[in-house]
Amino acid sequence: MTIAAENLTANHPRRKWTDYFTFCVDHKVIGIQYLVTSFLFFFIGGSFAEAMRTELATPSPDFVQPEMYNQLMTLHGTIMIFLWIVPAGAAFANYLIPLMVGTEDMAFPRLNAVAFWLTPPGGILLISSFFVGAPQAGWTSYPPLSLLSGKWGEELWILSLLLVGTSSILGAINFVTTILKMRIKDMDLHSMPLFCWAMLATSSLILLSTPVLASALILLSFDLIAGTSFFNPVGGGDPVVYQHLFWFYSHPAVYIMILPFFGVISEVIPVHARKPIFGYRAIAYSSLAISFLGLIVWAHHMFTSGTPGWLRMFFMATTMLIAVPTGIKIFSWCGTLWGGKIQLNSAMLFAFGFLSSFMIGGLTGVMVASVPFDIHVHDTYFVVGHFHYVLFGGSAFALFSGVYHWFPKMTGRMVNEPLGRLHFILTFIGMNLTFMPMHELGLMGMNRRIALYDVEFQPLNVLSTIGAYVLAASTIPFVINVFWSLFKGEKAARNPWRALTLEWQTASPPIIENFEEEPVLWCGPYDFGIDTELMDDEETVQTLIADAAGS
């Protein structure tokens, strides 16, 4: 049900389309720039995945040669992590945080623009490595393998990640400062939206872990270019040191990729279930707990790397412990759904897809956290299936949920719901068909990252490839929906979902200054069910806001 609210944008100047191609400091423009750029890289990285799955439909190299397969595999992983999911989280944070806390812009607008404009050059550098021999050592780039493949392709990979990592650090500084220092006067930490809590936890992880990755990459670059031996065993270096440095960032990176979308789900579910969030403080504090525990679990990636037994036990325990705050979130979301007036629109369908898929990824995560089990499935397709259920079934489903939820606010247009539902159905079927067989392949002993495999693995690989084609097809209704809705969609009201957070108090899309006057907290961000009949009347809502401002 929509509310016929005045579209304030009509009375104010709007951003021109050319602003989205310039060094604009408006956080909303930067948020859209991040979102569009991340999806462009999603299509590039996804096309690499389709090429890989086409090759894996047969045991022998029929479609691409093993060297090209290794390059595609390396760039696919790097793009999907560093140029799709991470920037997509930054897109929502840039667009929403100032609106949610009731301020005009980020704390450091120019720094915010610099952060974005480091990302496209990073992506261009990475893809241009094809012209000099793309890296073949995987997205982890372990030495000595990374020291033996194409030197200049590997160097471009390093420079790309340094640019994107710098972008993440600059963005995190902005997010933390804006959340802590620029909230409106009536908003304390426990009355701000849970998305802001999620970004506070994410930004803390970025600031603590990304410099460690940068140091590892710089040392690896010296080994490549200057002939040093920090990680080269031929000269007395230790490759395991690189693994520790790399995973000290790259396991927290999993939470950097999922925590923003935990925040998205915490916004979507109460709005479309018409019910207060269950356990606000539990969800908020569990984000901080995940952020802390995420820094002390990295060596579970190294159970087979000569890690001492006592250290294995420590990291197994901390890895299993991190399931506790994650489980708190799952139970809180399910508690919010229980007894709610659920609206099965596109945003909510993807939220349901997130819940079911992420729980599968979480359960398999507890399995691989166990040392005896991990030793047997390490570097097999079981691990590939696990992390794709976490990152695609988790982050990507929540990303699409957020796109459908905030599309009216960002564009001033409603999405086409039948196309959105078709997008969800194809994505859900394709995702499970692609990644579920990988668990069985891993248990059967199929190694990851290799183009050649035994013929006994072919039936499940064919099934997985069919699923990948369904996933590719699922993007068609999504793209059609976005462009059709932009130009032909029904005009959106200021608050079509009858939500309570501050971004819905301004026009759709928001005016350049965000708000005509300082917004007012007239209720909590999730006070659904309290005089809910009032929410059906926009005039009554505005009266309540005015009364709150007067008091």
Curated annotation (Swiss-Prot):
Gene it is expressed from: ctaD
SUPFAM superfamilies according to UniProt: Cytochrome c oxidase subunit I-like (SSF81442)
Keyword annotations: Cell membrane, Copper, Electron transport, Heme, Iron, Membrane, Metal-binding, Respiratory chain, Translocase, Transmembrane, Transmembrane helix, Transport
Molecular functions per Gene Ontology: cytochrome-c oxidase activity; heme binding; metal ion binding
Entry's family note: Belongs to the heme-copper respiratory oxidase family.
Binding residue positions for Fe(II)-heme a: H76, H388
Name of the protein described by the UniProt record: Cytochrome c oxidase subunit 1
Binding site for Cu cation: H251, Y255, H300, H301
Pathway(s) per entry: Energy metabolism; oxidative phosphorylation
NCBIfam families in the record: CtaD_CoxA (TIGR02891)
Binding-site residues for heme a3, renumbered to this chain: H386
Main location: membrane
GO biological process, one term: aerobic respiration
